[in-house]
From Swiss-Prot:
It comes from Syntrophobacter fumaroxidans (strain DSM 10017 / MPOB). This is Ribonuclease H. It catalyses: Endonucleolytic cleavage to 5'-phosphomonoester. Binds 1 Mg(2+) ion per subunit. May bind a second metal ion at a regulatory site, or after substrate binding. Endonuclease that specifically degrades the RNA of RNA-DNA hybrids. The keyword Ribonucleoprotein does not apply. Monomer. Mg(2+) 2 binds at residues 22, 146.
Length: 164
């Protein structure tokens, strides 16, 4: 499924960047990692990060937020994720959440509200096309992002073990 988010009117849109992103968690919640691959004109940049106590959904959001923050100027962006939560949240639910003061239809706070706000802000300068792929289905970039996320967890768990 694809979702498109339009940016405000601006001069001719510039560069087209592809972002692939994934999050992982050991336990849910538990230690987590995220990975992203940014591609522009055949060149790739890999990003990853870690959180000590988090959820898989938080890591999915963090991956895209950090990837968008890495862009130095407004771009046309295609974001590919295996997270339906992320794809549906940004394409379908976020508009109502904002209208309702970041509350759900049953008047509770939106889960991961701070991350959704950060993602919304990170999206603003860009024209974004959201793509969904099935996770662990052999999609090369998604598999790479998953490996980056898992490696971030492993790296930090090893560091924590050697500090003890």
């Amino acid at each position: 499924m694809r979702g498109r988010r339009r940016m405000p009117e601006t001069p001719a849109i510039r560069k087209h960047v592809e972002i692939f992103a994934d999050g992982a968690c050991r336990g849910n919640p538990g230690p987590g990692g995220w990975g992203a691959v940014l591609r522009y004109h055949g060149k790739e940049k890999e990003l990853s990060g870690y959180a000590e106590y988090t959820t898989n959904n938080q890591m999915e959001l963090a991956a895209v937020i950090q990837a968008l923050r890495a862009l130095k100027e407004p771009c046309r962006v295609t974001i590919t994720t295996d997270s339906r939560y992320l794809r549906d949240g940004i394409s379908l639910w976020i508009h109502k959440w904002k209208q309702n003061g970041w509350k759900t239809r049953v008047k509770t706070d939106v889960r991961n509200k701070e991350l959704w706000i950060a993602l919304d802000e990170a999206c603003l300068p860009h024209e974004i096309d959201w793509q969904w792929v099935k996770g662990h289905s052999g999609h090369p970039e998604n598999e790479r992002c998953d490996a980056l996320a898992r490696a971030a967890i492993d790296r930090h768990l090893r560091e924590a073990a050697t500090e003890e």
